Amino acid sequence: MKALSPADQLFLWLEKRQQPMHVGGLQLFSFPEGAGPKYVTELAELLRTYSEPEYPFNQRLTKRLGSYYWKEDHHFDLEHHFRHEALPKPGRIRELLTHISAEHSNLMDRQRPLWECHLIEGVRGRRFALYNKAHHSLIDGMSAIRMATRALSNDPNAKDLPPWWAMQPKKREATSPTATDFISSLTQLSNSAGKQLSTIPTVIREVYKSVQQANENPDTVSIFQAPQCILNAPITGSRRFAAQSYSMDRIKAIGKAMRATMNDVVLAICGSALRNYLINQHALPDQPLIAMVPVSLRKDDSEGGNQIAMILANLGTHIADPSDRLSVIKASVKDAKKRMSQMTPEEALNYTALTMAPTGLNLLTGLAPGLQAFNVVISNVPGPKKACYWNGAKLEGMYPVSIPLDGIALNITLLSYEDQLEFGLTACRRTLPSMQRLLDYLENGIKELEVAADL
């Protein structure tokens, strides 16, 4: 048996009916040339032959003395984990997203390994889909994306590729923070006590400076600046998932014309979409929304190590002009990255944990609903740069399906694939009605920036 880390156990303790703690991914494929009408059925038969899962997909939970452990499941039943399903006609993307929304709402059985794979046929246009989900205590979102990518091939002629549960495990790598890793960062404050204590003077000084700067400049973000908003209401267990691909060239062209990074432009697009959505719901706060955003602090071309921090970014939702909104976002992100870059890794980690503490405290106890560090999570994750195939089928899109939390009812996660940015929006269905309209508002956000940039 293997004990779960404190952070992984925390994802289990946080789980409740209205707050499932699994991450997922939707992959959309087109049929290979010459594929017959039984192609997906034959693919399902092939996948069923992989009945012996590799680690960690053969592990189930057990509990001793109040703590969770992993142990091998000696009664593994593939039929429970792998499901072959069909969409109702007419099999549009609307029906597919409705199906994923319903599946992502369901809790998983803790008496079995905490993962599922859904092979979905009947998608209009000779396409099929894969929806994978796994509990965050078993695998984090970034690792799930890497595993799903490793199951693919750049060769359209490669056949008999195993599914992700049957791949040989790789040595665990340091990964970028995912949308819920601010919870994990809170637990780090109790680890390596000597090192952590030595960071306290710097952390307190930087928090104080950020509060002072926020008092002098309303566009600067500090720890308690996020306004109350419908995005931060209590959630139910019902989910709505929306997804769309947007051209990366359009985003890059805006950034080049307006001297902004691609991440800045993405935040501006999201800020525009959220502003229009909240106006439509008669719920736009007077103060700007604050996003929690993982960003890179790497100063060189090195690849090793983890040089990622989670910052708070002003989304400028109180500003109607798209150019002015982008300027506020650029300044906000630049200020936050500068502050982080001047700290040691331990100081940056603890600064992140302290600034996220109000949200973490409320999430764990519900005692401080007025202490809101941020309103929404926006993550941008690198994906495959070349076209990918799975048993001859071309991957057309790859969309993250993430975790809304009580008080953080919307999660926006992006994945880059080839020349596309794949947006995956996951929200509480009741808290944020008609959330799928955000897709139209995202397109509008791109168009208004293109106009502002004279493109």
Regions found by a protein language model. Name each.
Residues 14-19, 367-368:
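Short secondary-structure boundary/capping segments within folded domains
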Residues 1-8, 26-37, 44-55, 59-408, ...:
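Soluble acyl-CoA-dependent acyltransferase catalytic core bearing the H(X)4D motif
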